[in-house]
């Protein structure tokens, strides 16, 4: 029996590059075993709504073949089914003076935000700075260890996991046939982007019994 679109499962996983470097891990116990534990990380099972792009294509394809309780190690995912190949047009050059105007200290290897994009400074010299906006894992084949822990059946729990994935901040409550998202809380003065609201609303109304979503901001 395979996983179908709209089913929500919880998984634990370890993601590695092909040379063995861990780039993501969901289990606190496993992180300690691997020597990569950090207190800053929120370790917990990862929700995956099948068919909605919660994980990379190659991993979702494998999850579709698995059942609750299944686990598999060293799932080999080629770059084209992970974060794609590296694209030369995502490496751009800027005058260093533009960063100095913003009082940004430019150092090779640092992550930097330019407009709405985040990239890595790969070189500087002659008054110019080159920034690579490719995903850090683009062009790399990846290896995953994954275990399917649970299939979420209850609609309220399902909605809570979708909320955590799509929005993450605020409170969620339930009325008959309706979900209320309260984002008007201390420390979160930014609005939820309209595209995020749209995705959340579509996933809720398509994959749970709830017919309406109300946002309070």
Locate predicted features.
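FKBP-type peptidyl-prolyl cis-trans isomerases
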Residues: 1-217
